[in-house]
Amino acid sequence: QIAVVCGGQYVVIEGGVARPGWDDDLIPPTSVAFSDGYFVFSHEDGRISHTGNDDAHSIDGLAYSAAEISPDKLVRVMGLQQYVLAFGARSIEWWVDVGGDPFAFQRDFAIQIGCAASGSCALVNQTIAFVADDLTVRVLNGHEAVKVSNLAVDRALASEGDVASIVAKTWRSRGHIFYAISGTDWTW
């Protein structure tokens, strides 16, 4: 099963066929990640929800919790090792599968730095890089978001008129991993 979220729509691709995977009575998702057999969703109101284990079509309306360490908008969820990371506009929360019912995950840790652009989040060398709410590029190192951008990149981010539209691309070449971000009229 492959899960896709775009424009508030959740689609499951299975056997080459795409089918809607969301109940219209539930709050539309803004992103999806995979962890421990669950597809995990972010919702703009700060909720995190998930499917049944190993079943992208099974969604329990009570299987949710709130990323609420900070009263910010939930921007994106991503899976990283045994964690689901909930990127808020001003915070990041680590959630771990504890087998709870109906919601399987429990908050494990949180930091007070957020994500300015959901499309900037990318897996890089077994961690996540992203554009932070202070308009710098950061890489997670354990539970710390380490600044990796130089002043030229910081200036490009500060001058971007639509920070939320920044997107990232990663690739590997000759043993090196690259992370590039693109704004309205620039790429670094």
Residue ranges and their predicted role:
Residues 1-2, 8-9, 16-25, 32-38, ...:
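Beta-sheet-dominated scaffold domains
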Residues 43-59, 94-100:
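Blade/loop signatures of beta-propeller domains
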Residues 63:
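Catalytic phosphate/metal-binding cores of nucleic-acid and nucleotide-processing enzymes, i.e., regions
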Residues 66-67:
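Helix-loop-helix junctions within predominantly alpha-helical proteins
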